[in-house]
Amino acid sequence: MANNLKKFETEAQYSAATLNYPAVSWVTNGHSVHFDKTAPTPTFGGLTVYYYIDNPNVEITLFNGGGDSSGGESDSGSGGGGALPTTMIVDGNSETPINTWRFETAGEHIVQYTFENNEIPYAFMQDIGYATKIEIGNDITTIPNENADGKPFGNMIELTSVTISNSITYIGDGALNGCFSLETITVEATTPPTLGSLAFDNTNNCPIYVPASVVDEYKNSTSTGWSEYASRIQAIQ
Protein backbone atom coordinates (compact mmCIF):
# COMPACT_ATOMS: atom_id res chain seq x y z
CA MET A 1 0.00 0.00 0.00
CA ALA A 2 2.88 2.40 0.80
CA ASN A 3 3.95 2.40 -2.85
CA ASN A 4 0.55 3.82 -3.77
CA LEU A 5 0.87 6.87 -1.49
CA LYS A 6 2.46 10.14 -2.56
CA LYS A 7 2.93 13.31 -0.54
CA PHE A 8 2.99 16.84 -1.99
CA GLU A 9 3.90 20.06 -0.20
CA THR A 10 1.61 22.28 -2.29
CA GLU A 11 -1.43 22.04 -4.54
CA ALA A 12 0.76 23.25 -7.41
CA GLN A 13 3.03 20.23 -7.01
CA TYR A 14 0.04 17.92 -7.10
CA SER A 15 -1.39 19.60 -10.21
CA ALA A 16 1.95 19.28 -12.00
CA ALA A 17 2.40 15.60 -11.15
CA THR A 18 1.51 12.73 -13.42
CA LEU A 19 -0.05 9.86 -11.51
CA ASN A 20 -0.54 6.77 -13.62
CA TYR A 21 -0.80 4.20 -10.89
CA PRO A 22 -3.47 3.54 -8.24
CA ALA A 23 -2.79 6.42 -5.88
CA VAL A 24 -3.97 8.28 -2.84
CA SER A 25 -2.14 11.57 -2.27
CA TRP A 26 -2.26 14.41 0.19
CA VAL A 27 -1.04 18.01 0.41
CA THR A 28 0.37 18.87 3.83
CA ASN A 29 -0.10 22.64 3.86
CA GLY A 30 -3.61 22.59 2.47
CA HIS A 31 -4.64 19.46 4.35
CA SER A 32 -6.11 18.04 1.13
CA VAL A 33 -6.58 14.42 0.16
CA HIS A 34 -6.80 13.40 -3.51
CA PHE A 35 -7.95 10.12 -4.97
CA ASP A 36 -6.24 9.62 -8.30
CA LYS A 37 -8.50 8.24 -11.04
CA THR A 38 -5.84 7.04 -13.46
CA ALA A 39 -5.48 3.56 -11.99
CA PRO A 40 -5.00 1.01 -14.79
CA THR A 41 -7.18 -2.06 -15.07
CA PRO A 42 -5.29 -5.09 -13.68
CA THR A 43 -4.11 -7.46 -16.37
CA PHE A 44 -5.92 -10.81 -16.40
CA GLY A 45 -3.52 -13.74 -16.39
CA GLY A 46 -5.72 -16.39 -18.00
CA LEU A 47 -7.55 -16.51 -21.32
CA THR A 48 -9.85 -13.63 -22.28
CA VAL A 49 -12.30 -14.15 -25.15
CA TYR A 50 -14.46 -11.42 -26.68
CA TYR A 51 -17.73 -12.70 -28.16
CA TYR A 52 -19.97 -10.61 -30.39
CA ILE A 53 -23.63 -11.58 -30.20
CA ASP A 54 -26.21 -10.54 -32.80
CA ASN A 55 -29.10 -12.55 -31.41
CA PRO A 56 -29.29 -12.69 -27.60
CA ASN A 57 -31.98 -15.38 -27.78
CA VAL A 58 -29.58 -18.04 -29.06
CA GLU A 59 -27.69 -20.33 -26.71
CA ILE A 60 -24.12 -20.55 -27.98
CA THR A 61 -21.16 -22.79 -27.33
CA LEU A 62 -18.47 -20.82 -25.51
CA PHE A 63 -15.81 -23.52 -25.65
CA ASN A 64 -15.36 -27.23 -26.22
CA GLY A 65 -15.64 -29.53 -23.22
CA GLY A 66 -17.79 -30.13 -20.22
CA GLY A 67 -20.93 -31.10 -22.08
CA ASP A 68 -22.14 -34.24 -23.75
CA SER A 69 -20.75 -35.37 -27.11
CA SER A 70 -22.47 -32.50 -28.89
CA GLY A 71 -21.52 -29.85 -26.34
CA GLY A 72 -24.98 -29.55 -24.86
CA GLU A 73 -27.94 -27.74 -26.37
CA SER A 74 -26.62 -24.99 -28.61
CA ASP A 75 -26.41 -23.86 -32.21
CA SER A 76 -22.94 -25.38 -32.52
CA GLY A 77 -22.09 -29.05 -32.67
CA SER A 78 -18.50 -28.53 -31.61
CA GLY A 79 -18.71 -29.43 -27.95
CA GLY A 80 -17.30 -32.51 -26.36
CA GLY A 81 -16.46 -33.99 -23.03
CA GLY A 82 -13.12 -32.27 -22.47
CA ALA A 83 -11.83 -30.44 -19.42
CA LEU A 84 -13.70 -27.50 -17.98
CA PRO A 85 -11.93 -24.27 -17.05
CA THR A 86 -11.14 -23.85 -13.36
CA THR A 87 -12.93 -20.50 -13.24
CA MET A 88 -15.11 -18.51 -15.64
CA ILE A 89 -15.94 -14.79 -15.44
CA VAL A 90 -18.75 -13.54 -17.69
CA ASP A 91 -18.90 -9.77 -18.18
CA GLY A 92 -17.21 -9.26 -14.82
CA ASN A 93 -19.30 -11.78 -12.88
CA SER A 94 -17.89 -15.05 -11.59
CA GLU A 95 -19.93 -18.00 -12.88
CA THR A 96 -19.86 -21.78 -12.61
CA PRO A 97 -17.90 -22.98 -15.66
CA ILE A 98 -20.23 -24.32 -18.35
CA ASN A 99 -19.68 -24.55 -22.07
CA THR A 100 -23.01 -23.14 -23.30
CA TRP A 101 -24.42 -19.71 -22.55
CA ARG A 102 -27.35 -17.50 -23.45
CA PHE A 103 -26.45 -13.80 -23.33
CA GLU A 104 -29.31 -11.48 -22.46
CA THR A 105 -28.18 -8.62 -24.69
CA ALA A 106 -26.70 -8.24 -28.15
CA GLY A 107 -23.24 -6.77 -28.65
CA GLU A 108 -19.82 -7.56 -27.23
CA HIS A 109 -19.42 -9.80 -24.20
CA ILE A 110 -16.19 -10.71 -22.43
CA VAL A 111 -15.57 -14.13 -20.90
CA GLN A 112 -12.39 -14.90 -18.97
CA TYR A 113 -11.10 -18.38 -18.15
CA THR A 114 -8.44 -19.85 -15.90
CA PHE A 115 -7.22 -23.44 -16.11
CA GLU A 116 -5.72 -26.14 -13.94
CA ASN A 117 -1.93 -25.74 -14.04
CA ASN A 118 -2.53 -22.75 -16.35
CA GLU A 119 -2.75 -25.14 -19.31
CA ILE A 120 -5.26 -24.50 -22.09
CA PRO A 121 -7.06 -27.79 -22.86
CA TYR A 122 -6.59 -29.39 -26.26
CA ALA A 123 -9.05 -28.15 -28.90
CA PHE A 124 -10.52 -25.74 -26.34
CA MET A 125 -11.80 -23.25 -28.93
CA GLN A 126 -11.77 -25.38 -32.09
CA ASP A 127 -14.55 -24.26 -34.50
CA ILE A 128 -16.09 -21.90 -31.93
CA GLY A 129 -18.14 -19.09 -33.47
CA TYR A 130 -18.99 -15.61 -32.19
CA ALA A 131 -15.47 -15.12 -30.78
CA THR A 132 -13.83 -12.07 -32.39
CA LYS A 133 -10.79 -11.45 -30.18
CA ILE A 134 -8.56 -13.52 -27.89
CA GLU A 135 -6.01 -12.40 -25.30
CA ILE A 136 -3.71 -15.00 -23.75
CA GLY A 137 -2.47 -13.72 -20.37
CA ASN A 138 0.80 -13.97 -18.49
CA ASP A 139 -0.16 -17.02 -16.43
CA ILE A 140 -0.23 -19.17 -19.56
CA THR A 141 3.17 -20.26 -20.89
CA THR A 142 2.23 -22.80 -23.56
CA ILE A 143 -0.41 -23.24 -26.25
CA PRO A 144 -0.83 -26.98 -26.84
CA ASN A 145 -0.36 -28.87 -30.08
CA GLU A 146 -3.36 -29.96 -32.07
CA ASN A 147 -4.41 -33.55 -31.45
CA ALA A 148 -7.12 -35.91 -32.66
CA ASP A 149 -9.80 -33.65 -31.15
CA GLY A 150 -8.61 -30.57 -33.01
CA LYS A 151 -6.52 -27.43 -32.69
CA PRO A 152 -6.57 -25.20 -29.58
CA PHE A 153 -7.90 -22.22 -31.55
CA GLY A 154 -8.36 -23.73 -34.99
CA ASN A 155 -10.97 -22.77 -37.58
CA MET A 156 -12.42 -19.88 -35.59
CA ILE A 157 -13.74 -18.14 -38.67
CA GLU A 158 -14.96 -14.97 -36.92
CA LEU A 159 -11.73 -14.38 -35.02
CA THR A 160 -10.00 -11.13 -36.05
CA SER A 161 -7.39 -10.48 -33.34
CA VAL A 162 -5.10 -12.56 -31.13
CA THR A 163 -2.73 -11.19 -28.48
CA ILE A 164 -0.23 -13.53 -26.82
CA SER A 165 1.54 -12.34 -23.67
CA ASN A 166 5.26 -12.07 -23.04
CA SER A 167 5.29 -15.17 -20.84
CA ILE A 168 4.58 -17.60 -23.67
CA THR A 169 7.35 -20.11 -24.44
CA TYR A 170 5.64 -22.52 -26.84
CA ILE A 171 2.92 -22.12 -29.48
CA GLY A 172 1.76 -25.54 -30.60
CA ASP A 173 1.24 -27.22 -33.94
CA GLY A 174 -1.73 -25.77 -35.81
CA ALA A 175 -2.54 -23.39 -32.94
CA LEU A 176 -4.38 -20.81 -35.09
CA ASN A 177 -4.57 -22.75 -38.33
CA GLY A 178 -7.77 -22.06 -40.22
CA CYS A 179 -8.64 -18.72 -38.60
CA PHE A 180 -9.29 -17.19 -42.01
CA SER A 181 -10.55 -13.78 -40.81
CA LEU A 182 -7.58 -12.83 -38.65
CA GLU A 183 -6.41 -9.24 -39.08
CA THR A 184 -3.65 -9.15 -36.46
CA ILE A 185 -1.57 -11.54 -34.38
CA THR A 186 0.44 -9.87 -31.61
CA VAL A 187 3.15 -11.76 -29.71
CA GLU A 188 4.58 -9.73 -26.82
CA ALA A 189 7.44 -12.10 -25.93
CA THR A 190 10.91 -10.56 -26.24
CA THR A 191 12.38 -14.05 -26.64
CA PRO A 192 10.83 -15.84 -29.63
CA PRO A 193 8.79 -18.77 -28.29
CA THR A 194 9.17 -22.11 -30.00
CA LEU A 195 6.62 -22.35 -32.79
CA GLY A 196 4.96 -25.61 -33.81
CA SER A 197 4.37 -26.58 -37.41
CA LEU A 198 1.57 -24.82 -39.32
CA ALA A 199 0.81 -22.73 -36.22
CA PHE A 200 -0.14 -19.62 -38.21
CA ASP A 201 -1.04 -21.16 -41.57
CA ASN A 202 -4.34 -20.21 -43.20
CA THR A 203 -4.63 -17.03 -41.12
CA ASN A 204 -5.40 -14.52 -43.89
CA ASN A 205 -1.69 -13.69 -44.31
CA CYS A 206 -2.25 -11.13 -41.55
CA PRO A 207 0.64 -9.21 -39.97
CA ILE A 208 2.35 -10.72 -36.94
CA TYR A 209 3.40 -8.00 -34.51
CA VAL A 210 6.34 -8.53 -32.14
CA PRO A 211 8.40 -6.17 -29.93
CA ALA A 212 10.38 -3.71 -32.07
CA SER A 213 13.68 -4.61 -30.41
CA VAL A 214 13.50 -8.24 -31.57
CA VAL A 215 11.90 -8.05 -35.03
CA ASP A 216 15.06 -9.29 -36.74
CA GLU A 217 15.53 -12.03 -34.17
CA TYR A 218 12.05 -13.33 -34.93
CA LYS A 219 12.51 -13.07 -38.69
CA ASN A 220 15.83 -14.92 -38.64
CA SER A 221 14.90 -17.56 -36.07
CA THR A 222 14.92 -20.85 -37.96
CA SER A 223 15.38 -23.02 -34.87
CA THR A 224 12.11 -21.80 -33.34
CA GLY A 225 10.16 -21.82 -36.61
CA TRP A 226 9.56 -18.07 -36.96
CA SER A 227 11.58 -17.57 -40.14
CA GLU A 228 8.77 -19.30 -42.03
CA TYR A 229 6.60 -16.24 -41.34
CA ALA A 230 9.35 -13.61 -41.77
CA SER A 231 7.49 -11.63 -44.43
CA ARG A 232 4.58 -11.09 -42.05
CA ILE A 233 6.55 -10.04 -38.97
CA GLN A 234 6.39 -6.36 -38.03
CA ALA A 235 7.12 -4.19 -35.00
CA ILE A 236 4.39 -3.54 -32.47
CA GLN A 237 3.32 0.07 -32.93
Task: Give residue spans per PLM region.
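Extracellular ectodomain segments of secreted/surface proteins
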Residues: 42-82, 117-140
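Short, aromatic/basic amphipathic alpha-helical patches
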Residues: 198-199, 216-230
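Consensus positions within tandem repeat domains that build extended binding/scaffold surfaces
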Residues: 146-152, 172-177, 197-199
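Short, solvent-exposed S/T- and G/P-enriched segments that are highly enriched in secreted/extracellular
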Residues: 92-102
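Short, surface-exposed terminal/edge motifs of secreted or surface/virion proteins that either
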Residues: 21-44, 216-223
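Noncatalytic modules at the cell exterior or secretory-pathway interfaces
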Residues: 60, 102-113
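Structural signature of tandem-repeat unit edges
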Residues: 90-91, 108-116, 129-142, 154-170, ...
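Extracellular/surface-exposed low-complexity repeats and stalk/linker segments enriched in Gly/Pro
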Residues: 1-24, 32, 184-197
